[in-house]
């Protein structure tokens, strides 16, 4: 009874078949961990000032690179299993769904993919890593459940009350082996071991909570939160490696992952101390896509239409004035030298008009005489103008007499002046 309450068993199998398609627990937990990391990372990225959805775009680079890097690290540190005497061969080396991912390779090559994605979006890689750090450690915790279903990465034999029972499994060919990934448990216990997968799972959950707390209290940025995650994970991984008893590469009697954890921990601590304090400017997290789209916002169709309408309203009086000036010039050549039609009474304009009239009065002399004949009050002015124009007398005498001899000119000026004022008032 005490044994049943103390030890906990391994799952009876780690793979199920949906027809010809195998459904592996290890792959399901890896996918679940990736989804959880992306969901948490996206929310954290938006909370820091970034644009929502960018995490998923960069994940298209990060996840494939991370999976390949994790597999390469596993093959490099456990090469005898595949290419040593009696090794599984190249076919087993590429079957990533059978298990075997090294977190250090996944983080290293995944960082390369993240750098490519961040560069394409114009956002800083350290800020992206800070937003994703808690999600990564949570994904690692979820992924350890896949090791539990595969009966792998366990520790040395133990008599502790929380020991893990490893069962013999029979594969479809009838071969019985506790390491069979496709087999089903026979119910016979092969050994009781340290549940190192559980130790690392609990440690990762503790780091996950610690990262969230530190990020809120200390406002870590510029990659410092990610460095804290790496340093914290290295401590736990170093301790777990001391308890593991599975096949691994050793250097001077020490597992290679222990060396890796030590060096990576030192690098993380150095970066944590050297990186800038505080957080990035939220505007720097928007990326180049947001900046490129921003100038288009203040130029909607309504603003353009309003600008055009205002331009037309201002240009209409000017156009009307230009058209009026053109018509008047075509009809009266002598008025081409009159720039201001609204001020016929000013002395300066009258002097300018009189100066220009002698040059253009010869063709219009009869026109000025026709309307003057029925008028009884202006014969003297007409007769006085003719000798003045012909003899070229001084313009002083014409200043006072100019409005009277040609009644058509002031009428035309008033007409165009009134029309111009109406258009300007309509503006």
Curated annotation (Swiss-Prot):
Q: What is its EC number?
A: 2.5.1.145
Gene Ontology CC terms: plasma membrane
Give start-end of the signal peptide.
Answer: none
Top-level taxon of the source organism: Bacteria
Which portions of the chain have biased composition (kind: Low complexity)? Answer: 299-330
Entry's Gene Ontology molecular function annotations: phosphatidylglycerol-prolipoprotein diacylglyceryl transferase activity
In which compartments does the protein localize?
Answer: Cell membrane
The pathway where this protein functions is: Protein modification; lipoprotein biosynthesis (diacylglyceryl transfer)
Leading EC class: transferase
Bilayer topology reads:
Multi-pass membrane protein
Task: Write out the ranges of the annotated region (Disordered).
Answer: 280-427
Where exactly are the transmembrane stretches of this chain? 21-41, 53-73, 96-116, 122-142, 189-209, 256-276
Q: Where is the composition biased (Basic and acidic residues)?
A: 332-346, 411-427
Please give the biological process terms from Gene Ontology that the record holds. Answer: lipoprotein biosynthetic process
Q: Which residues bind a 1,2-diacyl-sn-glycero-3-phospho-(1'-sn-glycerol)?
A: 144
Sorted UniProt keywords: Cell membrane, Membrane, Transferase, Transmembrane, Transmembrane helix
Q: Which Pfam families match?
A: LGT (PF01790)
Which InterPro entries does UniProt cross-reference here? Lgt
Q: Spans of biased composition, class Acidic residues?
A: 347-404
Q: Does the keyword RNA-binding apply?
A: no
The record's function comment reads: Catalyzes the transfer of the diacylglyceryl group from phosphatidylglycerol to the sulfhydryl group of the N-terminal cysteine of a prolipoprotein, the first step in the formation of mature lipoproteins.
Q: Which family, according to the similarity comment?
A: Belongs to the Lgt family.
**PANTHER family linked to this entry:** PHOSPHATIDYLGLYCEROL--PROLIPOPROTEIN DIACYLGLYCERYL TRANSFERASE (PTHR30589:SF0), PROLIPOPROTEIN DIACYLGLYCERYL TRANSFERASE (PTHR30589)
Q: What is this protein called?
A: Phosphatidylglycerol--prolipoprotein diacylglyceryl transferase
Q: Which organism is it from?
A: Mycolicibacterium paratuberculosis (strain ATCC BAA-968 / K-10) (Mycobacterium paratuberculosis)
Query: What gene, per UniProt, encodes this protein?
Result: lgt
């Amino acid at each position: 009874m005490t044994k049943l309450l103390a030890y906990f068993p391994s799952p009876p199998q780690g793979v199920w078949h949906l027809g010809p398609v195998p459904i592996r627990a290890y792959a399901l937990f890896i996918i679940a961990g990736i989804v959880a990391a992306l969901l948490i990372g996206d929310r954290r990225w938006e909370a820091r000032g970034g644009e929502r959805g960018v995490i998923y775009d960069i994940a298209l680079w990060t996840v494939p690179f991370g999976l390949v890097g994790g597999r390469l690290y596993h093959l490099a540190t456990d090469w005898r299993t595949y290419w040593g005497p009696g090794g599984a061969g190249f076919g087993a080396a590429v079957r990533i769904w059978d298990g075997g991912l090294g977190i250090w390779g996944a983080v290293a090559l995944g960082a390369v993919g993240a750098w490519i994605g961040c560069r394409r979006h114009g956002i800083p890689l350290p800020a992206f890593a800070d937003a994703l750090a808690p999600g990564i450690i949570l994904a690692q915790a979820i992924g350890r459940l896949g090791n539990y279903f595969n009966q792998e990465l366990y520790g040395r034999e133990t008599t502790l009350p929380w020991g893990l029972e490893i069962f013999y499994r029979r594969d479809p060919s009838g071969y019985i082996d506790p390491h069979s990934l496709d087999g089903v448990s026979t119910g016979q216990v092969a050994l009781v071991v340290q549940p190192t997968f559980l130790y690392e799972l609990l440690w990762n959950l503790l780091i996950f909570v610690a990262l969230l707390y530190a990020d809120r209290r200390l406002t870590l940025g510029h990659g410092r939160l990610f460095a804290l995650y790496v340093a914290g994970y290295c401590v736990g991984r170093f301790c777990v490696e001391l308890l593991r008893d599975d096949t691994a590469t050793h250097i001077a009697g020490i597992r290679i992952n222990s060396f890796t954890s030590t060096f990576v921990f030192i690098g993380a601590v150095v970066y944590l101390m050297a990186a800038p304090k505080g957080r990035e400017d939220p505007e720097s997290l928007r990326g180049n896509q947001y900046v490129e789209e921003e100038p288009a916002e203040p130029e909607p169709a309504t603003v353009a239409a309003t600008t055009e309408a205002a331009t037309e309203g201002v240009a209409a009086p000017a156009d009307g004035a230009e058209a009026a000036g053109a018509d008047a010039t075509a009809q009266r050549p002598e008025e081409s030298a009159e720039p201001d039609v609204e001020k016929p009474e000013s002395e300066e304009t009258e002097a300018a008009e009189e100066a220009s009239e002698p040059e253009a009065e010869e063709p219009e002399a009869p026109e000025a005489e026709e309307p003057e004949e029925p008028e009884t009050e202006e014969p003297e002015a007409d007769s006085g103008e003719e000798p003045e124009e012909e003899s070229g007398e001084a313009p002083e005498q014409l200043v006072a007499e100019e409005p009277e001899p040609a009644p058509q000119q002031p009428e035309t000026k008033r007409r165009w002046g009134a029309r111009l004022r109406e258009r300007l008032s309509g503006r």
